[in-house]
Swiss-Prot record:
Pfam families: Nodulin_late. Its main location: secreted. One of its GO terms (molecular function) is metal ion binding. It comes from Arabidopsis thaliana (Mouse-ear cress). Disulfide bonds join 29-49, 35-54, 40-56. Residues 1-22 form the signal peptide. It comes from the Eukaryota. Belongs to the DEFL family. Keywords: Antimicrobial, Disulfide bond, Fungicide, Plant defense, Secreted, Signal. This is Putative defensin-like protein 307. The lineage of its organism: Eukaryota, Viridiplantae, Streptophyta, Embryophyta, Tracheophyta. GO terms for biological process: defense response to fungus; killing of cells of another organism. GO terms for cellular component: extracellular region. It is found in: Secreted.
Amino acid sequence: MEKSALIFIGILLFSTCTSIMARTGYVSCKTNSDCVKLKCPTPFGGPKCISGSCECPFKELMTLPNDTNYGVAACIDYCKAKGEIVYACILNHCYSYKPPM
């Protein structure tokens, strides 16, 4: 019984290892294609290569269209128009999340 429990726990830990490593940034990368083998437990898509490490997105990232004003006010308005709560506007990228129900 103890052996089977240890084997089960070992398999469980091994199967979640890649997603844990992706969330904590232990997997190094140069492009987004280096992170394809990792699976993210988030609804915001697959892992992305950010600053040389694979990370799972936990907030939705929206890029403003090219024809918009690049000010913070335009960024906030664009994200609010999508029905999201604005978290931050940095370098023409809008970080937002869905409001709680």
